[in-house]
Amino acid sequence: MSKEISFDTIEDFTSNLSKHPAYGVAANAAQTNGIFKASQSTQSKVDLDPTFSVEIDTGSVTNQKQSGRCWMFSALNTMRHSIQKEFKLKGFELSQSYTFFWDKFEKSNFFFENVIGSADKPLGDRKVSFLFATPQSDGGQWDMLCGLIEKYGIVPKKVYPETANSENSRALNDTLNTMLRKGGLELRALVNEGKSTEEVEAHKAELLDAIFRMLATSLGLPPKSFNFEYTDDDGNYHIDKDITPQDFFKKYVGWDLENYISVINGPTADKPYNKVFSVEYLGNVVGGRQVRHLNLELSKFKELIINQLKQGEVVWFGSDVSKGGDREAGLLDTKIYQRDQLFDYDFSMSKADRLDSGESMMNHAMVITAVDLVDDKPTKWKIENSWGDKSGFKGYFVMSDEWFDQFVYQAVLNKAFLPEDVKKAYDEGKENPIELLPWDPMGALAFDF
């Protein structure tokens, strides 16, 4: 039975304020400076100095500007580091706009296929509503980028540079989502009118033709081949003529992307450890690589990341940067904002409770480039972000180990460095992963909620 808030109750609450001695000072501080500034601790700057015992040199950072391409920038950063080192190309960047174009195009087809497949359900069905709420966004996953690279390859940034619409993607997303919603309703109508598969597919092709034209107009037409011309750090001139994006990846990166797998730490009741999971409606390339995550206990999760760093390879990872972060200082720490002291309230929650209640979810991908080990235990981590070089330590952030425990959810690891039991668990589960609901927090990096 519901009960309203009475004015007597409000009077009691008002009287209770006097029981909190720091209320007056806290109120002045919060109202003058805002909650976060008023509760900010300076100790994090002391504890998180950028010194590390295991560190990989990765050079200058990139800048995703006003777009949600963190997952793409971070993944391409792991690859460009390899190119920079092997071919002596300091400052080299891969084109994030190139993979952005093909991601938008493939996501459009992915959306239409899901709309056609769910056309028998009412628009009010939760899954259908989920599809139409955000037909596509800038977000994505490591496996989704692998699917794009396996199909389209990659190119240097100077071959397919940024545009106004890749650097600030709001108008592009608004335009594309309008086209997708309109087209999606048309496809649903055709299916429900009993039109043939051929007629439905013909209309989908017309819709994709219009979308391709819009993307080419907004971002430029991606190259089928190009000349890769550069001078290396030793002053030597090179030219690789008429190379395709697919061959560029094979020649200059050369990774077998199947050897890189996603592991997560999702300590919720619906995700048993050592099992592989996928997320419904999460993907981009129809018929391409499926998003798959192997769930591991935190201690194992962390141990494997440290081992990869020791082997000299950086680690792509997904986290929740909306919690405990100071963007200007470049710090990620659970103690940086002490709201419990400001409000005399216990804000603590378990990692599982945050995930289950919507308090936390993956919303940003970055790259781990270093760890500081004291007595063989991690104390802090160095993070390559993609927000430009004006924040943090020339664009790098320092993450406390406690923040890692609470807000790091995913990492991509090279199978070459994994123990046999972890490889076996992944290989046994990857063909028939447990499918999570579309709105699961382990899929949140790819969606706008």
Swiss-Prot record:
The EC number(s) given in the record are 3.4.22.40
Q: Which UniProt keywords apply?
A: Aminopeptidase, Cytoplasm, Hydrolase, Protease, Thiol protease
Q: Where is the active site?
A: C70, H364, N385
Q: Which GO terms describe its cellular component?
A: cytoplasm
Top-level EC class as recorded in UniProt? hydrolase
| Gene Ontology terms, MF aspect | cysteine-type aminopeptidase activity; cysteine-type endopeptidase activity
Q: Which family does it belong to?
A: Belongs to the peptidase C1 family.
> What would be the name of the gene that encodes this protein?
pepC
Q: What taxonomic ancestry is recorded?
A: Bacteria, Bacillati, Bacillota, Bacilli, Lactobacillales
Species this chain originates from: Lactobacillus delbrueckii subsp. lactis
What name does the UniProt record give this protein? Aminopeptidase C
